[in-house]
From Swiss-Prot:
SUPFAM superfamilies cross-referenced by the UniProt entry: Molybdenum cofactor biosynthesis proteins
Domain of life, per lineage: Archaea
SMART domains hit by this protein: MoCF_biosynth
Database matches in NCBIfam families: PRK01215.1
Cited HAMAP family: CinA_A (MF_00226_A)
Pfam families assigned to the protein according to its UniProt record, in alphabetical order: MoCF_biosynth
Protein name: Protein Ta0487
Similarity field: Belongs to the CinA family.
């Protein structure tokens, strides 16, 4: 199984001004494309912090995806932080420069705009269909790093445009869930372990939807990865059925 990590960069996230929806979107996207997302980082706009996040993420990941810090301002330093991490210098990339010129038309190429065309040699730019700063796909010792803007619409559009570079053809992810009523999470907890032992390779997570001791209701989510999509789906569906059986055994009811 391939592992991935997600890095989001920005002081605005850490101080709570901006809700980190990018991490959720990227994590979901990677999971459904066959990756086990191992780690998530949120770091401030600081070269050392950014470089540290990439370095630690690359230790455990086949793919690292970052968002934020690609713009023209002084605190947009993700590319520089990544370059520092891998020991490369930034240089003007002609393809990236052409993308920037196309976006700004007759406007002057100020140092701030030119900054967005400076990338490490191991990266190639991907045109941003929504904004100005190109996204980057980088190769690092057999691993892959994708660097995206922080504006959600730009990030989402670029990530989808890079789908062919991300997808793992021989790995599938599937999940399903069942809602059970009148069973407390603490009462169902032993059966979570039992289901995971009975159906090897799946993950079972209980999500409380109400107060534990007053009208308890749980969503039991079951997920897994596998090479055989049909077999994986059947395993998950069988495990869902078993969860329902245990709920009834505990005096509850299945709402799904």
């Amino acid at each position: 199984m391939k592992n991935a990590s997600v890095i989001t960069v920005g002081n605005e996230i850490l101080k709570g001004r901006t809700v980190n929806t990018n991490a959720a979107f990227i994590g979901n996207f990677l999971t459904y494309h066959g990756y086990q997302v191992r780690r998530g980082f949120v770091v401030m706009d600081d070269l050392d912090e950014i470089g540290w996040a990439f370095r630690v993420a690359l230790e455990v990941s086949d793919l690292v995806v970052s968002s934020g810090g690609l713009g023209p301002t002084f605190d947009d330093m993700t590319v520089e932080g990544f370059a520092k991490c891998i020991g490369q210098d930034l240089r003007i990339d002609e393809d990236a420069l052409a993308m920037i010129k196309k976006k700004y038309g007759q406007a002057d190429l100020t140092p701030q705009r030119l900054k967005m065309a400076k990338i490490p040699p191991s990266c190639r730019p991907i045109e941003n269909p929504v904004g100005t700063a190109p996204g980057l796909i980088c190769a690092v010792g057999g691993k892959k790093v994708i660097i995206l803007p922080g504006v959600p619409k730009e990030m989402e559009a670029l990530l989808k445009a890079m789908e062919k570079d991300i997808i793992i053809p021989d790995t599938h992810y599937y999940d399903d869930s069942v809602i059970i009523a009148d069973v407390m999470e603490s009462a169902f907890a032993p059966y979570v372990d039992r289901i995971m032992k009975e159906f090897d390779g799946i993950y079972v997570k209980s999500h409380p939807r109400n107060v534990e001791v007053k009208n308890p209701e749980l969503e039991i989510e079951i997920s897994g990865f596998g090479e055989d999509e049909a077999a994986l789906r059947k395993k998950i569906e069988d495990a869902i059925a078993r969860a329902g059986e245990y709920a009834v055994k505990l005096g509850g009811s299945v709402k799904r």
